[in-house]
Every structure is written in C-alpha cells, then in structure tokens.
C-alpha cells in the first residue's frame, strides 16, 4: 500500500516536496524490513545497552537468583530468551525483540521470587505476542537511523553505529505499550504462573507494589495503569478458583 501511494504522488504532478518523498521512502523502507532483520538489529541494540549498563557478575547474588528463576524459560514457548540483571536503583524490567530480557536490581530487591516470576512472564509475553517487535519497527521507522542502516546494510543485515543504536534503544525502551498489549502480556504472565504451578496471587501483589510507585519513571513509564491491571488479574484468579 505504501509503494502505491508513493507512485501515485510522483505521477500526479502536484506540489510534493522532496522532503515528503523522502519521508514516504523511509516509511516504505521500514515496512519492507523483515522480522529477522529487526531481531538482528534488536540484538545489536541490546548489546550496546549491555555495554552502557552495569551487568551483574555471574557470581553475584542477583545473577544467581535470576538464573535460578529463569533457566526453565530459556526456550519457553518456542522462543530463544536470554536474561541479565542490570545493577541500578531504577525499578524496571524490559524485553527486546531478540528475546533479551533485562531485570533491574532495584526491582529484584522489592519483589519476592513469585512476584518476580510474574514480571518476567509478563516480559516474555511481550516478546511472544510481537509487542517488542512492533516497538523496534516503529522506533526504526521514526528515527534517523533508517537512512544510516539502509546505506550501510550488508549481507541482508542492518548495520548501525553505536550512537544510532543508543538512540534506537532509547526510543524502544521509552515507548509505552498499548492497554491491550499490557493486558495481553499480563494474561500471558498469569498463564505461565499457572502452567508452572506458581502462586498466582503473587501477580496481584507485584502489580500492587508497582502501582504504589506512582508515575516515578522506570517500569511505570512503559507499563502504566498497574492498579487496574491488578484488578484484572484478581478477576482471572477468581474465575479459575485459585
């Protein structure tokens, strides 16, 4: 559809500036990028993010705890997932399209194991449902990186410099999910807890804790409305009888 729109604008002879054509060209380029290319770009982007953050040492209590909780999930639901801890006072967790899930130490400090498992399940849901892929596609389409990547792509992969990767990561991690995406990811996390026979009440407790943080940034910036989400999970528990 985008290609047809570009062609019709070119042939009408109307007052179409080169800037408008460049923008439409960018839209077409972004739309033509494959999921596998975006996942590879996401992997590069996440590697840059790991380099910019303090990743917990494998022998630290945080890394050991996360590994204990997540080893069973590395191939969950046909996905290829990896998990790391960022040592940070920010309460946060996020996932990117390549299957990288990052949990911040401050979040781990405030959550029990079962509560943390729900948060992790929620993030896995964003990967499985394609929400993380949607985020990077939109961020890529709206960033200057699209020209840099198009100009330097080789062998089918998109190649970006560090500054472009950092800018793309910032856009991706700070973009809000829709209410439906959040609800679906919550439901996924809840189902995952039931699958492994974890205490589902911990999902409600986790969301209530996040809700008490208010709009203080971190996880609340991209995952809002935790209060109503807690009520929705409680309704699922009541429906299922446990």
Where are these regions (language model features)?
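Bacterial N-terminal signal peptides that target proteins for export
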Residues: 1-2
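A Zn2+-metalloprotease active-site environment signal
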Residues: 8, 14-242
């Amino acid at each position: 559809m985008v290609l047809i729109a570009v062609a019709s604008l070119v042939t009408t002879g109307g007052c179409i500036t080169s800037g408008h054509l460049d923008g439409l060209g960018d839209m077409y380029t972004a739309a033509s990028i494959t999921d596998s290319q975006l996942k590879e770009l996401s992997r590069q982007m996440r590697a840059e993010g790991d380099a910019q953050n303090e990743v917990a040492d494998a022998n630290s209590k945080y890394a050991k705890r996360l590994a204990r909780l997540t080893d069973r999930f590395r191939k969950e639901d046909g996905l290829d997932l990896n998990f790391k801890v960022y040592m940070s006072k920010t309460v946060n967790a996020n996932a990117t399209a390549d299957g990288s899930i990052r949990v911040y130490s401050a979040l781990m400090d405030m959550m029990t194991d079962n509560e943390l498992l729900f948060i992790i399940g929620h993030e896995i849901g964003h990967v499985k449902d394609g929400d993380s892929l949607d985020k990077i596609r939109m961020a890529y389409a709206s960033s200057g990186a699209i020209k840099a990547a198009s100009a330097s792509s080789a062998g089918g992969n998109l190649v970006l410099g560090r500054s472009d990767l950092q800018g793309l990561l910032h856009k991706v991690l700070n973009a809000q999910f829709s209410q439906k995406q959040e609800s679906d990811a919550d439901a996924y996390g809840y189902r995952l807890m039931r699958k492994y026979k974890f205490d589902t009440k911990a999902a409600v407790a986790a969301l209530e804790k996040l809700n008490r943080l208010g709009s203080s940034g971190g996880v609340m910036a991209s995952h809002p409305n935790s209060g109503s989400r807690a009520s929705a999970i409680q309704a699922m528990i009541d429906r299922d009888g446990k």
